């Protein structure tokens, strides 16, 4: 196999394992790929999404820090053109902010998420399910829900 063929084979296997709900096999494959290449974009993407999904399913305590770190590693490995990376990191930051009661700490997380979600919107304006609600919450939390940007999103998407 050439490096390109290996990447294609890895991608196909990931899709097959994911579609077949073979989580253990997928995680094992991703672990092996990251052991070979810690900056492998596709492996990091699967890892970040897997961590975020697990945190979302937690009912007692949701610790978003591992998902945030995974998405930050993915962002480092990206070329900056993938909206889902910016949206995923922005979503995780917003979800963490939603669990914090100290307003200043909460606002800081929304401020960190804001440019990420704006970038996701700019890169993929048609995929509003990935960024619109969270961007609306950021505008409302950082500025005001009466801010023209928040109002525009609310009117456009019906929040």
Predicted features and spans:
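Canonical positions in the second alpha-helix
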Residues: 1, 32-33, 73-74, 120, ...
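Short coil turns that delineate tetratricopeptide repeat
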Residues: 2-5, 38-39, 72, 76-81, ...
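Canonical tetratricopeptide repeat
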Residues: 12-15, 46, 84, 88, ...
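Short coil/turn linking the two alpha-helices of tandem helical-hairpin repeats
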Residues: 19-21, 48-61, 90, 95-105, ...
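Terminal, low-structured helical/coil segments at or just beyond the last alpha-helical repeat
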Residues: 111, 115, 119-159
């Amino acid at each position: 196999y050439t490096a390109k063929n290996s990447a294609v084979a890895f991608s196909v296997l990931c899709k097959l394992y994911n579609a077949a709900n073979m989580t253990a096999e997928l995680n094992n494959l991703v672990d092996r790929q990251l052991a070979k290449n810690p900056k492998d974009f596709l492996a990091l993407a699967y890892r970040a999404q897997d961590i975020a999904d697990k945190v979302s399913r937690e009912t007692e305590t949701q610790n978003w820090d591992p998902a945030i770190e995974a998405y930050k590693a993915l962002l480092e490995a990206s070329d900056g053109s993938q909206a889902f990376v910016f949206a995923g990191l922005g979503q995780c930051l917003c979800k963490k902010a939603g669990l914090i009661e100290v307003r200043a700490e909460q606002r800081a997380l929304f401020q960190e998420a804001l440019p990420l979600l704006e970038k996701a919107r700019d890169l993929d304006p048609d995929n509003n399910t990935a960024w619109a609600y969270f961007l609306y919450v950021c505008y409302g939390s950082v500025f005001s829900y009466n801010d023209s940007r928040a109002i525009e999103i609310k009117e456009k998407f019906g929040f």
